[in-house]
Amino acid sequence: MQGCKHIIGISILALANFAFQGCETPPEPTPTADFAHQLAPGECALRKLGPDEAWPDLTGAWKSRDAYLQEALAQDQTWYESPSSRSRFPQMFPFPDVCTWDQASSSIIAFRQILNDNADQAAFTSAFKQMFDCWQTKGWNGKGGVLFTGYFSPEFKASLTKVPGFEFPVYKRPKDLETDPVTGKAIGRRVSESEVVPWPSRAEINSSGMLKGLELAWFPTALDAYIVQINGSAKLLLPGGKVMFIGYAGATDGEYVGLGASLVKEGMIPANQLNLTAIRRLYEKDPATVEKMIDLNNRFVFFQNYDGKTWPAGSLGVKVTDKVTVATDKSVYPPGGLMFVDTQASTYSGSKQPFQRFMLDQDTGGAIRAPGRADIFMGIGPSAEILAGGQYCEGTLYYFFLKPEYVSQYPLPAKKAKAPAAGKTG
């Protein structure tokens, strides 16, 4: 969302700001782990593996390559072909020793070709290691430690007008919302040509009527409307079978406070039972209390219509792909980067299994604000919600970029000029 004004799905950690119950036997990340640990100013989150250091075993990634990976690579290439991608290097990823825009984009082209040209793992691995450098994350502990949670994209029943059963709105972007034109980060509320002030609290915004007339869609409950705000985009199922898509259009500068963390702190839901279903059940039983906790989150999100062709889209503005797209902190990790993720993933039964895949860094999220955090996109709808809700496992990740001497050999394909209209000449 940040940057391209589209966003992600519901991050289980973003909704809670607290990890939801993981696998059947809850995983045991390091007890003293500080996954929110921040790097020193100007420090790079990645370290290049030296010539004598062993690469990760890519066997699992090779075996798990599939049509989803190919689709995600195509989406990545589409993003690199857009002019806006160039502005991310080095302005938002100021580490040219890791990769430049040319290097990052060429890496995707080269990787796609290597995948297509090599039918066996040995040949692929040989070519891959010859042409690419491997960079491991420092993670939260300087040793590569990363907490992997999950997110998904839901569908919501909604109405374009306020009617019985649909009385809780989300709003269009107000004209006085001031945001950074490059990063999309909230600055405040412009009250005059020379003055920008902080936005009021969530409770004040809702009670004051200051957004009256900007209602974009109405939802059955305050919790639904809030989840849409946390999600940042939504597919709306309207009366009569119509479908509408809404996406992120900005947010206020208020402090983000996770609903789940608030509920656990107040003793309303035990930490080891925290998930979206538990929050919904509590809301059905005691909506006033949950709404009070919602009001503690003063980051208020605004929306706009969009055509849905790229839904669900990540922060790069391209469609995210099940179990291939990863959301990371884009202030420390390279957007669009080719990755290898080594962790465990939750199954529908709640058990866990090894998860080793080539993936792509195509998204970000409100709770993903450190090198020791990453969110895996699990898909759309209720089934994906189950996987996202159970995903809470530690692991590590690596990025791969072409060695400089190969970059010029793998440029983005030149765009074909459009043919002139019939009867016209240039």
Feature-to-residue mapping (PLM):
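Bacterial N-terminal signal peptides that target proteins for export
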Residues: 1-8
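Short amphipathic alpha-helical segments with coiled-coil-like heptad repeat character
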Residues: 2, 81-84, 341-347
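Sec-dependent N-terminal signal peptides
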Residues: 8-14
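C-terminal motif of bacterial Sec signal peptides marking the signal peptidase cleavage site
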Residues: 19-22
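Bacterial signal peptide processing site
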Residues: 24-27
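C-terminal segment of N-terminal export signals and the immediately downstream linker at the start
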Residues: 29-33, 37
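Secretory/export targeting leaders with adjacent low-complexity proregions
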Residues: 37-307, 314-318
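C-terminal soluble interaction/assembly domains
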Residues: 308-426
